[in-house]
From Swiss-Prot:
Zn(2+) 1 binds at residues 47, 69-70, 176. Coiled coil: none annotated. It comes from Schizosaccharomyces pombe (strain 972 / ATCC 24843) (Fission yeast). One of its GO terms (cellular component) is mitochondrion. The keyword Zinc applies. PROSITE patterns: ADH_ZINC. This is Probable S-(hydroxymethyl)glutathione dehydrogenase 1. It holds the Pfam family ADH_zinc_N. Binds 2 Zn(2+) ions per subunit. Its EC number is 1.1.1.284, 1.1.1.1, 1.1.1.-. Zn(2+) 2 binds at residues 99, 102, 105, 113.
Amino acid sequence: MSFEGKTITCKAAVAWGAKEPLSIEDIQVAPPKAHEVRVKVDWSAVCHTDAYTLSGVDPEGAFPIVLGHEGAGIVESIGEGVINVRPGDHVILLYTPECKECKFCRSGKTNLCSKIRETQGRGLMPDGTSRFSCRDKTLLHYMGCSSFSQYTVVADISLVAISHSAPLRSICLLGCGVTTGFGAVTHSAKVESGSTVAVVGCGCVGLAAMQGAVAAGASRIIAIDINADKEVYAKKFGATDFIDSSKVKDLVQYVIDVTDGGVDYAFDCTGNVTVMQQELQFCHKGWGKLCVIGVAAAGKTLDFRPFLVVTGRQVLGSAFGGVKGRSELPNFVDEYMQGHFKVDEYITNEEPLKNINKAFDHMHEGKCIRCVVDMNKP
């Protein structure tokens, strides 16, 4: 049965308000308009960014909304003017779009794209409206993806077609966490072979940064976390050292001592500005670089003595790992399919859509790296 041009009713996890459990609802998903694509979402992962918005501290957070931004599925139908995908294509949703036409895309200096940023930040499609409704109420879109719905509508620049042979259960992770961490090392910071690298925070993004450091040829990869249980994961993804920071009185001095002056690169995957300050201090004088990946809570600022940067240290940031989704993700998928790139290893838990709140519980318990949600099991 074809739903092309028709509204679809499906299951979705709706966030009606901040700090409230997600509610499984029957929602209506309108057909795609010009330059839009409707996707049947098969798998979605749960990310700390979803929890950040649900907590109510996200300045762009608004409700009611369909969260989720780490998803993969199959194109159901396309709107007028769509030429980059067609019905039946397997796709990864992209919260960082790539129009290839705006000032940012043409600069060659960033993976950020400005074309739909304003409306995406307001939870709307590029024309300023929503394709979701429930109980006669309009639902907002999330990060241009809304993967916690069995069907979603996205801009045609917010997804990329990938190999049909790639398992959607795994490659949905490339929509955020894995790409974000890996690319921060290889694309944003451009770590050189032989470097000493510190990764602070051993969740999915941090582990992916370690995988990136291995690929870059780093000679020493120091994983740092307050949870000693993360050591086994860190070593699995390439860490040569593990520091349980909860047991170290002066982390800055400790890292400086064990690295002969500090690290060449530090990657923050915590979003904690106090930790970021420590990381900058244990970057090596003269050339050490701090790459901030973790997103701090609204209103938080990073304070440091200018002397730290005057003497050669640098601070940079990374969004989606500096990776251009439409141009580069297909190659990531191919590398995974050839056995050269870890993805499956990040998945520690799986839940059906009806248990999505349990997926969030797994994430908060600290034992989960990534929990994937089977959207076909409502």
